[in-house]
């Protein structure tokens, strides 16, 4: 069941102020006694803006004029999925007064105007969606590093571990970014890349965001590339503190030798890109390589979902067949298996060695592309929380790093889930000291 609500950011008489209300000290209420925003649950068929007007009347005793929509978030509340939007509003009649007389709905015991958004921090920490949406909207006015720092504070994270970032030889990176710029056949839509700086600046950017460990995922698009990419990856990891030594392979006779050499050199993660590579993961030429990876227990970040454009060997079927032959593989399903989310969740539920990364999931860019994560699958994703890892696709993303993190926050899966996804699960997987 889906329950929809609206919360109201009532602008105060002085610039930068807004109205906050305090909930009753009800011991059964997780938000008891905290300051938050006035909100109402929408009736069936009720328009959000009509809900804003009703919130003013029922909760504050005033007439409100709805303004702009600040944002939306959702949260699994067990018996229902809560979807909540924040709206700006101004008072056009009356003076605020609490509590109002309707005892059938939550009333408030105190109100005041506040200027500091931090007044809502405790409510956000206790799970208030309306407080979180407001704080996210407010944080977008900050420099990006401060936005990421604010996300980390809200989530209780000292640092972040990102298992899906890309570093590669500059010539290859330029070719990859040119393909994105041209919205090539495997992209399917315009894709304005956010981070185009030189290599050292990109590394420094991640560190400024508090990213303590990250990958340098490489992937060949034709035979004969993997060995040289792996040599570059080994060198990059050796000269870049915090980089998890990354390697790759292709469906070719040298695959097992390439994988074996990379493991001997200390590779800690591999990338397999079935869409770009265009090969079948069940090609017999790959069997020895998969066997080595399974025996070594090295994770393989695998782009196997059919997004943004399907390939000949994408989708859950080829991966299910691969796992039937190599059940010990540690596969990290990139992009949560987008758009076949449910099928890949099923594979993760069946195979304890299968993990998922969050790359691009939940962002407006993906939602607008027609591949949103189904809200009904959020409980399954929550239950797999110890096998979900943060991925971002930095630097080749068409929005900011902060946008990607805040999109995860909007899932409403909670701070424990966020901490596990953005740090703890990867720390365990890669044996990174806390």
Locate each region found by the language model:
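Short, well-ordered coil/turn segments that N-cap beta-strands
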Residues: 156-159, 210-214, 239-245, 265-268, ...
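Active-site gating/metal-coordination segments in enzymes
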Residues: 212-213, 220-314, 363
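Catalytic pocket-lining loop regions of alpha/beta-barrel enzymes
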Residues: 268-269, 279-389
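Conserved N-terminal beta-strand and adjoining loop/helix that marks the start
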Residues: 1-19, 41, 72
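Mid-to-C-terminal alpha-helical segments outside catalytic/metal-binding sites
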Residues: 149-163, 173-209, 213, 384-387, ...
């Amino acid at each position: 069941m889906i329950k929809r609500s609206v919360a109201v950011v009532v602008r105060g008489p002085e610039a930068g102020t807004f109205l906050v209300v305090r909930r009753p000290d009800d011991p059964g209420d997780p938000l008891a006694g905290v300051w938050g925003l006035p909100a109402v649950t929408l009736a069936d068929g009720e328009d959000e803006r009509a809900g804003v007007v009703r919130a003013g009347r029922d909760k504050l005793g005033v007439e409100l004029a709805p303004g702009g929509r600040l944002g939306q978030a959702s949260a699994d509340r067990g018996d229902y999925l809560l979807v909540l939007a924040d709206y700006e509003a101004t008072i056009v009649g009356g003076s605020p007064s609490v509590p109002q007389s309707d005892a059938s709905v939550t009333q408030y015991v105190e109100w005041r105007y506040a200027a500091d958004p931090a007044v809502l921090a405790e409510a956000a920490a206790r799970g208030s969606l309306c407080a979180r949406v407001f704080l996210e909207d407010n944080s977008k006015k900050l420099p990006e590093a401060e936005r990421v720092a604010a996300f980390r504070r809200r989530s209780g994270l000292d640092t972040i571990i990102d298992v899906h970032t890309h570093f590669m030889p500059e010539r290859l990176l330029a070719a990859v970014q040119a393909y994105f710029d041209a919205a090539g056949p495997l992209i399917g839509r315009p894709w304005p890349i956010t981070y185009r700086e030189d290599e050292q600046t990109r590394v420094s950017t991640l560190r400024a965001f508090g990213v303590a460990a990250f990958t340098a995922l490489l992937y060949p698009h034709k035979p004969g590339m993997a060995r040289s990419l792996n040599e570059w990856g080994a060198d990059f990891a050796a000269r870049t503190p915090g980089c998890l030594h990354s390697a790759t392979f292709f469906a070719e006779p040298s695959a097992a030798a390439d994988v074996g050499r990379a493991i001997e050199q200390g590779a800690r993660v591999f990338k397999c890109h079935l869409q770009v590579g265009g090969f079948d993961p069940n090609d017999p030429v790959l069997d020895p390589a998969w066997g080595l990876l399974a025996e070594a227990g090295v994770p393989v970040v695998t782009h196997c979902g059919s997004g943004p454009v399907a390939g000949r060997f994408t989708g859950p079927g080829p991966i299910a067949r691969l796992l039937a032959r190599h059940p010990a593989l540690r596969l990290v399903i990139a992009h949560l298996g987008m758009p076949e989310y449910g099928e890949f969740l099923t594979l993760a539920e069946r195979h304890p060695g299968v993990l998922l990364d969050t790359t691009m999931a939940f962002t407006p860019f993906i939602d607008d592309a027609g591949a949103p994560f189904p809200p009904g699958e959020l409980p399954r994703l929550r239950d797999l929380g110890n096998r979900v890892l943060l991925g971002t696709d930095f630097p080749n993303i068409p929005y900011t790093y902060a946008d990607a993190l805040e999109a995860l926050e909007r899932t409403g899966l909670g701070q424990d889930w966020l901490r596990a996804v953005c740090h703890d699960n990867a720390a365990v997987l890669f044996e990174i000291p806390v």
